[in-house]
Amino acid sequence: ALRSALSALPVNQNRVVPDCEVRLTAGTNPQIVEAALDVTQGKLAMGFRTGGVTCWEEDYPAMVLCNAVFGGTTLSKLFMNVREKLSLCYYASSVLEKMKGLVLVSSGIEFDKYETARDEILAQLDQIRQGEIEDWELEGARRTVIGGYRATLDDQGRQEEFWLGQSAAGLEEDIPALCTQLETVTKEQVAQAAQKLQLDTIYFLKGKEGQHE
C-alpha cells in the first residue's frame, strides 16, 4: 500500500552519492582550529575518534555508557564537575555518533578559560580511563540511557526514527535487546572504552582581538 501511494511521486534517477571516507582513528597530533567572531561567549568543541568502535561492534554498549558517564547526562562528569563544581563552562556535554565512531564534546566558555576548560575536559576523560567512576555515576548513566530507549516505545515518531537508523545501519536489534546489553556493561568495560577514545580535533570560537579583555 505504501509503495502504491508513493508511486505517483516524481523520482530523480540521476542521484549522485558522493564518496565518503570515514576515519576511525585519530592522526598523530590533534588538529587545532581557532576562529574569531563578534561574539560574547566562546565555544569549545572537541572531537574524539572511538578507535573503531561503532554500532556494529560488540563493545558498542560500553562506548554508549562511556559517553553517558563522560558528558551524555546531567549526572556526567562534564556537567557535574566542569560546569557545576568548577564553573568553567556555561554548558558542557558530549554526544556519540554511532556510525562514524565519534564522540563530540560541546561547551560554552569565557574566552580566557579556554586552556583551563580544555585541560579539565581531558582530565575528566582520563578519570574514566583509569576506572575512577563512582557507582552512582555508572548506574545513573545506565538508568538514563535505558530510560531514554524505553521512552521511545511510547512515541511513534521516536520509534520511526529509531528503526530508520537501525535499517540504515543494517541492524536488527530492538530496544529491549539493546537495554539488556546495557544492563550487563561493567565499570571496567566503560574504562576500556574510554581508553580507545583518541583526541582528533579541537575547535575554539573566540571574540575578535581586544574584545572583552
Q: Which stretches of residues belong to each language-model region?
A:
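An aromatic/glycine/proline-enriched structural segment found at the starts
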Residues: 1-54, 211-213
